[in-house]
UniProtKB/Swiss-Prot annotation:
Protein name per UniProt: Hybrid PKS-NRPS synthetase TAS1
Active site annotation, chain numbering: C1429 (for beta-ketoacyl synthase activity), H1565 (for beta-ketoacyl synthase activity), N1608 (for beta-ketoacyl synthase activity)
Pfam families (alphabetical): AMP-binding, Condensation, ketoacyl-synt, Ketoacyl-synt_C, PP-binding
GO CC annotation, single: cytosol
Provenance organism: Botryobasidium botryosum (strain FD-172 SS1)
Biased composition (Basic residues): 1128-1140
UniProt region (Condensation (C) domain), positions on chain: 43-397
């Protein structure tokens, strides 16, 4: 075409620059001078200005943000006056007209206030003007930075010449943007024209508005709902993007980014690329039906994609400048431009091989259109949000458009900026544009920039014609799609037929062996592709050894987890197919699956073994394999190399999925390997999964949609992630799992998706595939705006899905015909799949007609196993000769091939929560379960998430029916309501009229309610009542809480009844799911329980405690630990207020020769185990020695246990006392076994390979209910370290912070005394910025330095925690400080002028915490205490209690010790203070301690609050305890007691729910005294061995002390240890002791099973760390810490107040 023939630039773009140094110019610095006394207006900087401010103050001498406007003025012009006098006159007028040109910029003296600008009164404003006559003078004047606090933001330069003058307006970008410069050009031309002719319209002396009003309006905007909506949009623009990483071919050999502190400042180079005429720009825009700038932005995105790296299915973003100027500010000069990131959808290359340039441009244009509506949102706020949530906050390429200037005598020199590449379009006067590129020459060579230019010109020409607009993106050189896997092309049906999914996964193991294949953050487990390949090979060899081969079926009766994946692929590799037998199915359902599938091998695990025992007894399979392992045939004895392929055919079976069937038996759908391969191959363009993408396994493996999760994810090279509790994957728990595992993609049914809280950020989640049932339009609209939503449709019989429709973020009216609901749009068929609409005679209808959907193609399955008649009915050959499946779904096809779905044709087959159900099958099960039932009608309930059954006659016991039905039907097939009525409506043929039942459900329910129905009772149970067990023979049991227990039980039972819509009361032994519950109803149950009892429970809590009884215990324990005023007592014995009773001895267990349980498979054993688990709410491992009380049982639970045992073993009639005395499992089996005739299990030999899962760290045990606390901020001053980084560095490098100091030289010494002139000192201890705290100087001089320094470190710690205090509001922060005595008072040289205050200074001295609360403006509790060296840990415990009881939401815990006078000390050998001036804990040379000073603070929150707030966490505090030694085993008050200390450690460990083997390290008090160290370690060993039952042979616990580094910091010492422990957890390593040469004989580490920390100790994620602090006199404290979740770990850097305020006032005795 004629356009775009010559793209060479008509003129050059340049900017006023050399390097960013001003070679001959005076250096510029920011002086932060005060505003002029003639200031007329003060306003905070706008958010856009603040983003530039941070760059400015770091390098005020830089010219990177200088924006220059040039005028070339002819002095002889007839159009305007170009004289110097006219120029100066115009400058003066504009300075008075525009407040921004006469403003100065300043940092606030209050760090909580933003920087501001001060507008000088126009009467006192004087512009900065230079008149120069040489180029050198011009360069010196122009190439300088700004001192914005003095000079203002603009510098005028007049370059004189004979016939012309040049005017330069050099402005800082913080004050003006490109549109303001355009406005300024117009106003200067207007003024000069007016001065020439006195006829042009003169400008008004002031503007209609001012920039200050805009700043205030912007601040107001940040508090509006529209701001939150905009944040949501902008988050979507950076979600799923990564910073651009340039290809190495583009970069210099050693690219360097010079900082602005070097002598050669960072600078940029400008390259003018091309010119575009108005006609060319118009044609460009018309071709793509959008603006030319949007087309250009899209092409720049493609250009950058070609020359950069990016991960699979990730996008990139460009900063695009938006005007963001309000209409009322049109004539105001200021910085309105807002550069914001626009997503460039590079992932389109992977989403579709046929992705077209036109579609790509359209996506970018949509993003820009939406961005224009939200252009007011500040970029700096988005960056902060991105950093908090782990999103991309780094943008290296910018695109901008500067509108045309007033005349061709004007030129604009753009800013250089800080981007790697800055594409700048300047509008020409004729409407054309010039493109220039400003780039970083330290990164790119000129040749690389030339390559970019050539490629961009090629892209422009590539985009010219309509034919090119429809070309594939991949056809452009360098933009080929990144493939998930090396599978055949989609058109090669034969090649896909030959593929095998397990072979494709094997390809990934070859390509990326170290890539994560399987992962679980909760379980702390993962497997790489290489490890998965090896494990599946071993399991395949095992199957082959057991007889597995082609044609066989392996039944997988496994828990949801890694094992299921291993054995699925092992079955494939062995040549067999697999079928999943869900462990939750009833025996009759499992029996049907075993029988229909003809499985000869069954694989199970230890968790699922109990529910499979009957099948083993009945020999339902030839071979049973357990993953639990045995010494005979462990799986790791099998080879890791692949099996030899026995040869395969096209129709080899891959798996059998069982669905509901109308005959009363499940239907087994047989899917062959080639059908599975076709689905996985066809889904590649629609499923956003690939290398480095994390997908969550949400669905049950018995549900065919799970294939999309485990097959597609692993074939495409992604990472498949698992939750610990799959059944609980709804609501907040699902969101928690997404965040913890950093999930990018998940598959869910609409029922599950509807529970996912849309208010949660979930920053890593990029896409969701939803299907399995009808999805409400509201759910689609909610999530399509947040993520890429994929709407899936496909019957099980056609292999998972036949359409995968990617929904646009907003409904496009052009794409949706009138009257079409978005929820009915399923999209177009997958490649090689055909969908037809047929009438009842199976004639294919034209598009647009409604009928039954029929599906053909290579994904159509083999059919149903052993159901020939049904196969003939559902699978047929259509008129085109294609094998076709009749789906039973009603729909139509639009002209473009889009499939619309309108539901089922047969309303007796429905979908509930993703499961396809034949209602007739359930009705047959009901009649089989109870022969009294004459007629039955099962319907979907009103909400569509459950079933409702009506039965006749009204005398049917509905609860007995439900219990009987549980023997035949899976949980999801059991109606949540069964209502008995007198009659059901019938047809003329005397059959139940199900349509009328559906229509009249409300009336039938009302009739059933009037008639009444049976309650939810177990067969041997009685209705709920207050328990009243006989007490005559158990007087030793305290049952005073029974009435309260019964009240709580009755309340929870009523909640269940309401949630389940049950007709009668519910008893404690019924499980929630057996009573008709499901995972969706758990949401309602959770809300009701939390509302009724005022406690917080998690989804996993409710899944683990699934009966009324266990939930009562859960609620009781939560209320007991929460300190709530509405306390409901737990099972535990209430504390008596009278004399403390003696410890109750454990009842002795009668001797028994039954000392070992053979695999817990005996009926008696299994029954008792189940009862224990239900009563205790315990789900761990049980063995013969398991003790009821040691597992958490109490005397109050014995009557419950006794009652349950009598129900199970009614013939035994054992007394409650006997049960009480038989405390172990073995004893109760022995006690009750004699009353049971069932023989003990005698299993035949089974192959039992060991677990194949490779775990890098052991599984973390699931935590019982407990409160944890998070350390989210810290700061401190320590000997030898003034910041936290310095503190850590000193510890890591084992340096000594104790230093030499003078003093006491003239003090008299006793016979054995020595003067030691060493001490742990704080640097600059006497310096304090009183002005910063707005404190009178004289008052500050008298203030205890402990208070001064605590003010600073408390504020720094709060800042480190991201907590900004409101100086005008009520800050809900509590302050708890352990502090030493104020010794400064006596040495203070400055006295108060108030005589009364001087006389009573001891009484008038405010506490450290009170002083901090005043100056920090906090309103929470404040406490200062002194328990000697344990003070800070005691303060920590009080702070935790304040959080637990709701007194405050944030606590600042402090420790302070600064002792005056600052001098050495006098001591003598054998005393507590060292004669050598060195602290050496545990060393043979240790001789005491050395005094040390420290002031430090940590910020703690409740862990749940910290995680919800997105805080970065150093460590969790799991438990803490304080105690006293008493006097019974102490020779004196100053001697520590090991037993007193052990008691405190025990209580802290119990509160933390920690076991000794979990403790990797303990930071002990370790004062360096021989006796003190020995007694302390003795106490630690007593706690672990005698109180907590540490087993022999466990790893020795590491012990360390920081006293060798800092000395004994007295009241602060415990918090110093906490900070060290928290940093150790955060960094994953414990620093070693400073100095340990020879272990002293006073410490027997081997006997104590402890080890000194000689070397750095690596910590794993599950390791815990203890901290002990011992106060003189017997006040002891112990704390247990652990690691937070990986996504909450601390990553940000520390800031210190002294870095922000370096000018410090000396305050001390010397002054």
């Amino acid at each position: 075409m004629a356009l775009f023939h010559n793209l060479e630039p008509k003129r050059s773009i340049d900017f006023m620059s050399g390097a960013r140094t001003s070679s001959g110019s005076p250096s510029v610095s920011y002086s932060n001078s005060l505003p002029s006394p003639h200031t007329a207006l003060v306003a905070p900087l706008s958010k856009m200005q603040r983003a530039l401010w941070f760059d400015y103050i770091s390098a005020p001498e830089s010219t990177m943000y200088n924006l220059t406007l040039k005028f070339k003025l002819d002095q002889e012009s007839e159009e305007y006056d170009g004289s110097i006098s006219a120029i100066l006159r115009a400058i003066d007028f504009l300075t008075k007209r525009h407040g921004m040109l006469r403003s100065t910029f300043h940092n606030s003296s209050n760090p909580s206030q933003p920087p501001y600008f001060a507008e000088i009164d126009s009467r006192h404003a004087h512009p900065t003007t230079h008149i120069v006559s040489s180029s050198e003078q011009l360069k010196r004047a122009a190439l300088r930075g700004f001192d914005l606090s003095v000079d203002g933001p603009i510098r005028w330069i007049v370059f004189t010449n004979v016939k012309s003058n040049e005017l330069y307006a050099v402005a800082h970008h913080i004050a003006v943007d490109g549109s303001s410069m355009s406005q300024l050009s117009k106003e200067i031309i207007t003024l000069l024209t007016h001065y020439k002719h006195q006829s042009a319209e003169m400008l008004a002396p002031t503007t209609t508005s001012n920039y200050g009003l805009y700043c205030l309006a912007q601040d107001s905007y940040t508090h509006q709902e529209s701001y939150k909506k905009a944040l949501h949009f902008w988050s979507s623009q950076i979600a799923g993007t990564l910073p651009m990483e340039w290809n190495s071919s583009m970069l210099r050999t050693n690219p360097a980014r010079l900082t602005q502190t070097t002598s050669q400042l960072d600078h940029r180079v400008c390259s003018t690329w091309l010119s575009l005429t108005p006609q060319e720009l118009k044609a460009w825009g018309n071709l793509y039906k959008t603006s030319w700038f949007r087309v250009a932005t899209a092409l720049i995105g493609l250009l950058c994609a070609k020359h950069s790296k990016h991960k699979f299915r990730t996008d990139q973003s460009l900063l695009v400048a938006f005007g963001a100027r309000p209409e009322q500010s049109n004539d105001v000069l200021g910085h309105f431009a807002n550069g914001m990131p626009i997503k460039i959808p590079i992932s389109m290359l992977e989403r579709s091989e046929s992705a077209q340039l036109g579609g790509f441009v359209k996506e970018v244009s949509k993003n820009i259109s939406a961005a224009k509506r939200e252009e007011m949102f500040p970029y700096v706020d988005l960056v902060q949000h991105a950093r908090r949530n782990g999103l991309n906050s780094e943008h290296r390429v910018s695109v901008t458009f500067s509108p045309k200037l007033a005349s061709d005598i004007c030129s604009l020199y753009p800013v250089e900026g800080v981007c790697d590449l800055f594409f700048c379009f300047l509008e020409e006067e004729d409407g054309g544009a010039i493109l220039g590129l400003i780039y970083d020459p330290q990164l790119f060579t000129p040749d690389a920039i030339q390559t970019l230019r050539e490629d961009f010109i090629q892209l422009i020409r590539f985009s010219l014609s309509p034919e090119d607009a429809t070309q594939s993106l991949a056809s452009f050189p360098g933009l080929s799609a990144r493939q998930q896997f090396n599978g055949p092309p989609l058109h090669d049906v034969v090649a896909i037929d030959q593929c095998r999914v397990h072979a494709l996964v094997q390809q990934q193991a070859t390509l990326r062996p170290e890539q994560l294949a399987l992962y679980s953050e909760e379980l702390q487990m993962y497997m790489t592709y290489e490890e998965l390949e090896m494990a599946t090979n071993q399991a395949a060899h095992c199957l082959r050894a057991c007889g597995s081969c082609k044609g066989e079926v392996v039944a997988l009766h496994l828990s949801h987890g890694f094992d299921m994946i291993i054995w699925i692929y092992a079955a494939f590799k062995s040549g067999a197919a697999f079928t999943v037998v869900d462990p939750s199915y009833p025996p009759t359902r499992k029996s049907a699956i075993f029988e229909l599938s003809k499985a000869k091998i069954c694989v199970y695990d230890s968790k699922t073994a109990p529910s499979l025992q009957w099948a083993i007894d009945e020999n339902l399979c030839s071979v049973f394999i357990t993953t639990a392992g045995s010494d005979n045939t462990p799986i790791d004895r099998f080879p890791t190399h692949p099996l030899t392929d026995e040869g395969s055919t096209l129709d080899d079976l891959a798996y059998i999925i069982f669905t509901s069937g109308s005959t009363g038996l499940p239907k087994g759908v047989m899917v062959a390997h080639r059908q599975l391969s076709h689905f996985v191959s066809a889904a590649r363009d629609c499923t956003p999964v690939g290398p480095s993408v994390r997908a969550l396994q949400v669905l049950s493996f018995s549900f065919d949609a799970a294939v999309l999760e485990y097959a597609a994810t692993l074939v495409y090279g992604g990472t498949l992630c698992f939750a610990e509790h799959r059944d609980a994957l709804v609501g907040d728990y699902l969101a928690d799992v997404v965040d913890a595992n950093k999930i990018n993609h998940l598959t869910a049914t609409p029922s599950i998706l509807a529970t996912l809280p849309a208010a949660r950020e979930m920053p890593t989640l990029r896409s969701i595939c939803v299907g399995g049932e009808h999805c409400p339009e509201g759910v689609l609209n909610t999530w399509r705006q947040r993520v890429q939503l994929i709407h899936a449709y496909g019957p099980t019989e056609t292999t998972v899905a036949v359409t995968l429709h990617r929904l646009p973020r907003e409904i496009d009216p052009e794409e949706v015909a009138d009257g079409v609901s978005p929820s009915s749009i399923m999209g177009k068929p997958l490649p090689n799949v055909k969908i037809y609409v047929c009438d009842t005679s199976r004639r294919i209808l034209k598009n647009g007609k409604i009928g039954e959907l029929h599906i053909s193609g290579p994904q159509v399955s083999r059919g149903y196993i052993d159901r020939e008649e049904l196969n003939a009915e559902k699978f047929w050959i259509n008129e085109h000769g294609e094998r076709t499946y009749a789906s039973g779904d009603r729909g139509r096809i639009l002209p473009d091939g889009t499939v619309l779905l309108y539901g089922r044709i047969n309303n007796r087959e429905i979908k509930v929560r993703g499961y396809r159900l034949e209602l007739g099958e359930i009705e047959k099960m009901i009649t089989k379960a109870d022969t009294q039932v004459r007629t039955v009608s099962v319907q979907a309930n009103v909400t569509g998430d459950g079933l409702l059954a009506f039965v006749t006659p009204r005398t049917v016991d509905t609860e007995a029916l439900r219990l009987a039905l549980a023997k035949y039907a899976p949980r999801y097939m059991i109606p949540s309501e069964i209502l008995a009525i007198d009659a059901l409506p019938c047809t003329v043929n005397d059959k139940v009229d199900h349509a009328r039942v559906q229509r009249d459900m409300a009336d039938l329910r009302a009739r059933a309610s009037k008639l009444g129905t049976a309650s939810l009772l177990t067969p041997n149970d009685t209705p709920l009542q207050s328990p009243s067990p006989p007490l005559s023979d158990i007087s030793q049991l305290d049952l005073t809480d029974d009435l309260e227990w019964a009240a709580a039980k009755a309340r929870i039972a009523e909640i269940w009844r309401q949630v389940l819509a049950a007709p009668g009361p519910i008893l404690g032994g019924v499980k929630f799911f057996e009573a008709g519950g499901n995972s969706l109803l758990v949401l309602k149950l959770k809300a009701e329980i939390e509302g009724a009892f005022g406690v917080k429970v998690s989804f996993s809590d409710l899944f683990q405690n699934s009966t009324v009884d266990s939930q009562v215990g859960l609620v009781q324990s939560r209320r007991g630990s929460s300190g709530s005023p509405r306390t409901v007592r737990s099972h535990a014995r209430p504390q008596r207020k009278a004399k403390t009773p003696p410890r109750q001895a454990r009842p002795e267990t009668p001797e028994s020769d039954y000392d070992q349980l053979p695999d817990l498979r005996d009926d008696v054993q299994q029954s008792i185990c189940s009862i224990w688990m239900e009563v205790l709410g315990y789900h761990g491992k049980l063995d013969a020695k398991s003790n009821f009380f040691e597992l958490g049982g109490t005397s109050l639970q014995i009557p419950i246990l006794h009652k349950a045992l009598l129900r199970e073993f009614p013939a035994s009639n054992v007394s409650l006392v006997k049960v009480f005395q038989s405390a172990t499992l073995a004893a109760q089996v022995e006690l009750l076994g004699r009353f049971t005739e069932s023989p003990r299990f005698s299993p035949r030999p089974a192959i039992t390979p060991s677990a194949a899962v490779v775990s890098r760290s052991p599984r973390r045990p699931s935590s019982p209910a407990r409160e944890q606390y998070a350390i989210v901020g810290m700061s401190g001053r320590f000997p030898g370290a003034s910041t936290i980084p310095e503190f850590w560095d000193l510890l890591v490098h084992q340096r000594d912070g104790i230093q030499a100091i003078g003093g006491l030289e003239d003090a008299p010494l006793g016979p054995n005394e020595v003067l030691v002139q060493r001490r742990g000192l704080i640097k600059d201890v006497e310096h304090f910025d009183h002005e910063f705290w707005k404190m009178p100087k004289n008052y500050a001089l008298r203030m205890d330095p402990q208070k001064r320094h605590f003010l600073n470190v408390a504020l720094e710690a709060l800042d480190d925690a991201g907590i900004e205090l409101d100086p005008q509001g009520q800050n809900d922060v509590g302050i708890f400080v352990g502090s030493s005595e104020n010794t400064f008072r006596e040495y203070c040289a400055t006295r108060s002028e108030d005589a009364f205050e001087m006389r009573h200074s001891h009484h008038m001295d405010t506490a450290v915490s009170a002083t901090a609360a005043y100056y920090l403006n906090t309103f929470g509790p404040n406490v200062t205490l002194n328990t000697a060296c344990s003070s800070a840990l005691v303060a920590l415990k009080l702070g935790m209690d304040a959080l637990a009881t709701g007194q405050t939401k944030v606590v600042c815990v402090g420790g302070c010790t600064i002792e005056y006078p600052l001098q050495g000390y006098i001591t003598e050998p054998g005393k507590v203070l060292s004669t050598t001036g060195e602290v050496r804990p545990f060393d043979a040379a240790s001789d005491g301690s050395v005094p040390g000073d420290a002031v430090c603070a940590v910020i703690i929150k409740r862990a749940t609050d910290a995680l919800a707030d997105g805080d970065q966490i150093y460590a969790f505090v799991d438990g803490a305890a304080v105690g006293s030694d008493g006097h019974l085993d102490k020779p004196g008050i100053t001697v520590p007691s090991p037993r007193g200390q052990a008691e405190t450690i025990k209580r802290a460990m119990q509160q933390a729910h920690a076991r000794p083997e979990q403790i990797a390290h303990v930071e002990v008090h370790g004062s360096g005294t021989r006796m003190g160290d020995a007694l302390e370690l003795e106490g630690l060993s007593i706690a672990y061995d005698q109180h907590l039952g540490r087993q022999a042979g466990q790893r020795p616990v590491s012990v360390g002390s920081n006293k060798g580094n800092f000395g004994n910091c007295e009241a602060a010492s415990g918090l110093v240890s906490i900070i060290k422990a928290a940093l150790s957890i955060s960094n994953g390593v414990v620093p070693p002791l400073r100095k340990l040469e020879t272990v002293g004989d006073h410490v027997d580490f081997m006997r104590l099973n402890l080890t000194p920390a000689r070397e750095p100790l690596r910590l794993s994620r599950h390791d815990k760390v203890g901290v002990t602090s011992l106060g003189l006199g017997g006040s002891t404290a112990h704390v247990v810490l652990s690691a937070p979740p990986g996504n909450a770990r601390r990553t940000k850097e520390w800031k210190q107040i002294r870095e922000l305020h370096p000018t410090l006032l000396p305050c001390g005795p010397a002054n």
